[in-house]
């Protein structure tokens, strides 16, 4: 194990949406050099094969209602190992900059004078659009995108989302972690006059061979989820750009 008391640095690395081949070259390189890799539950285990044989690999959970480590415990672990001079990686699914609780962890690290380097990953929404062969932007159909989290409903108590502004402020809307609160989210869309005919795609296990898609409308998707027993982890993309996928399939 490499010890260097002057390092005191943590790499926060995006593991991408799941497909190991979508891991960036830089992420692969730092994984090969790491002494300690602290990873989330949604990271594909195949990605850990890039770690050197004697690296310590620690799973910290982070699935809904099943956190093996609290956020504070994770931060403490990162700080402790970095202060020992070990090469530390915090490995997160997707891109850590999008709904990855990055802010909480980097503030803790900075407060202890620990340097960080963030290595972005491919976020799941991009993998979904690539798999289904539609763009997230289009000159006629979608010139703006909004990223939302479906978990905001039950977790946030202040500064709640201004749904009417958000829904009418973007052509394409991407909702991560949508499944648990899907009925509430659909109700919000409809309550501000959003069309029940608006296209939506719901995706589970983006980029992996076991991926699962549901294509429908705002008005039909809840029934489709119930009928198909669709499960997490999943995200939704809403907007007219989805129609390009259907057009391509007909060609």
UniProtKB/Swiss-Prot annotation:
Any GO BP: siroheme biosynthetic process
PROSITE patterns assigned: SUMT_1, SUMT_2
Record's keyword annotation contains Transcription regulation: no
Subcellular location: Plastid, Chloroplast
EC number: 2.1.1.107
Reactions catalysed, as given in the entry: uroporphyrinogen III + 2 S-adenosyl-L-methionine = precorrin-2 + 2 S-adenosyl-L-homocysteine + H(+)
InterPro entries: 4pyrrol_Mease, 4pyrrol_Methylase_sf, 4pyrrole_Mease_sub1, 4pyrrole_Mease_sub2, CobA/CysG_C, Siro_Cobalamin_biosynth, Uropor_MeTrfase_CS
CDD domains in the record: SUMT
Binding site residues for S-adenosyl-L-homocysteine: 17, 93-95, 123-124, 177, 206
Chloroplast found in the keyword field: yes
GO molecular function, one term: uroporphyrin-III C-methyltransferase activity
GO CC annotations, alphabetized: chloroplast
Pathway membership: Cofactor biosynthesis; adenosylcobalamin biosynthesis; precorrin-2 from uroporphyrinogen III: step 1/1; Porphyrin-containing compound metabolism; siroheme biosynthesis; precorrin-2 from uroporphyrinogen III: step 1/1
The entry's keywords: Chloroplast, Cobalamin biosynthesis, Methyltransferase, Plastid, Porphyrin biosynthesis, S-adenosyl-L-methionine, Transferase
Location, primary (coarse class): plastid
Family label: Belongs to the precorrin methyltransferase family.
Functional note: It is a step in the biosynthesis of both cobalamin (vitamin B12) and siroheme.
Name of the protein described by the UniProt record: Uroporphyrinogen-III C-methyltransferase
Organism expressing this protein natively: Cyanidium caldarium (Red alga)
Lineage: Eukaryota, Rhodophyta, Bangiophyceae, Cyanidiales, Cyanidiaceae
């Amino acid at each position: 194990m490499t010890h260097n008391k002057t390092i005191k640095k943590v790499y926060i690395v995006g593991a991408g949406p799941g497909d190991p081949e979508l891991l960036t070259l830089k992420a692969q390189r730092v994984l090969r050099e790491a002494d300690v890799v602290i990873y989330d539950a949604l990271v594909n285990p195949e990605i850990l094969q890039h770690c050197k044989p004697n690296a310590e690999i620690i799973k910290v959970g982070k699935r809904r209602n099943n956190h093996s480590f609290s956020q504070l415990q994770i931060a403490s672990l990162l700080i402790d190992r970095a202060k020992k001079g070990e090469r530390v990686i915090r490995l997160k699914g997707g891109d850590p900059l999008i709904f990855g609780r990055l802010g909480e962890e980097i503030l803790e690290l900075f407060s202890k004078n620990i340097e960080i380097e963030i290595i972005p990953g491919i976020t799941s929404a991009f993998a979904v659009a690539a798999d289904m062969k539609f763009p997230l932007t289009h000159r006629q159909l979608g010139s703006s995108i909004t990223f939302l989290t479906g978990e905001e409903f039950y977790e946030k108590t202040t500064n709640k989302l201004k749904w009417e502004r958000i829904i009418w402020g973007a052509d394409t809307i991407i909702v991560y972690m949508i499944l648990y609160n899907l009925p509430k989210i659909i109700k919000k869309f409809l309550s501000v006059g959003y069309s029940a005919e608006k296209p939506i795609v719901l995706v589970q296990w983006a980029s992996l061979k076991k991926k699962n898609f549901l294509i429908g409308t705002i008005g039909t998707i809840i029934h489709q989820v119930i009928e198909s027993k669709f499960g997490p982890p999943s995200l939704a993309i809403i907007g007219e750009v989805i129609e390009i996928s259907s057009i391509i399939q007909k060609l």
